[in-house]
Amino acid sequence: MITRRQFLSGACVSACAGLQLTGEAHAGTSPEDLVTRAMAGIDPHAYLDVHNHVVGMGHGDTGVTVHPHMTAGLSHPLNWIRFRAYIRASGITDMDNVDANYMAVLKSRVEAMPTRGTSLLMAFDRVHDEAGKPRPEHTVFSVPNDHMFNAVKLSERFAPCASVHPYRHDAAEALHAVADRGAVAIKWLPNAMHIDPASPLCLPSYRVMAERGLTLISHGGEESAVPSPDTQELGNPLRLRAALDAGVTVVVAHSASHGHSLDLDDPKRRRTRAFDLFMRMMDDPQYDGQLYGEISAVLLFNRVSHAGPGLMARTDLHHRLVNGSDYPIPGINPLINLTQLWGLGLIRWEDKRGLSRLFRENPLLGDFVLKRVLCGPDGEPTGFPPSVFCPSNEVFPSLAQQPA
């Protein structure tokens, strides 16, 4: 194994020689061996990926919407760059038929996985104001439940995760309706959807979720994928206590690994790392068996230094972590820096080249394998345990009730 000191001392020589220090010159572990290691102990049919976005541009009357600011390259260049990155990561080649092309690529990538389990497909409701009125001018994108349910029919590996904004006048009725259609969870991104999880307006929705066994998958921490400049505090994980106290099972997406939020337990309301606030909730015994952390994005370059090692070290909480990919995010190459992960001691140098190939060939597979070959505090590549990828039925009780 190459040590960090050897790497740094050789960097100058390699740079002068015009070589790239990407690990390509070292044979390392083959992708096949990495997959074999990743699958050890995994029940292929119990595998679960709880975080896959359904996106599009409304082609084919899907009802999907994208705010014009996301596609206006001249007036909103940063949003345009972000949007193009998602398109490229999704493997879309037909820009005249984006919605169907996106789902065709996702289906092929899911079905190419060595696992034979379930991937939740997520709808995404429009922004509504506190009066219950839709606000399309504030909606960055939306994916109707009807389109999501139609997409689920494309593969037996898909299962439905609906999205119902709690401020809607018909929120309770809509939640019952999606539960009747087989939804196993509800997706919220409070920062982008303008939802305050602590608002009394959410209580009717919480009652229905608890009654129907609909798990709430809610973003935690700051949001960077969807522009949300003025509403970041809505992602404060402490605001999800209202859902927990109402009896809802809650999965906090990304384990609130990005950004800072107000410490609502502190009289001075000091800004604190959102991940630390989430971990405080995980350590609260009253939420054991009801609160879970989802691990998508915890290895991205802008949060891996604290979230990755922090979660790997808390082996006492691993049974309360669940796997999610946040697809198509794993396909955006700059977001996952394998050299950075090696520098942090989270992967072995000899695994780096094989991981890079897996991400290029199938970002979903690369994401799964990376999480399974991570190095723990002792330096051994033990990865997140199989329980994270094959969670117990109590996390998604509605999924457990669905016919095999």
Task: Give the label of every model feature segment.
Residues M1-T3:
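N-terminal secretory signal peptides
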Residues Y47-M57, L216-G221, V252-S255:
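Histidine-centered catalytic micro-motifs
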Residues Q6-A27:
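N-terminal export signals
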Residues T62-P134, F141-A151:
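Alpha-helical scaffold segments that flank or form the walls of functional sites
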Residues L48-V50, M122, C161-A162, K187, ...:
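Active-site neighborhood of phospho(di)ester-bond hydrolases with catalytic His/Asp-centered motifs
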Residues A27-S30, H258-A404:
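H/E-rich (His + Asp/Glu) clusters that bind or coordinate divalent metals
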Residues L21-V50:
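C-terminal segment of N-terminal export signals and the immediately downstream linker at the start
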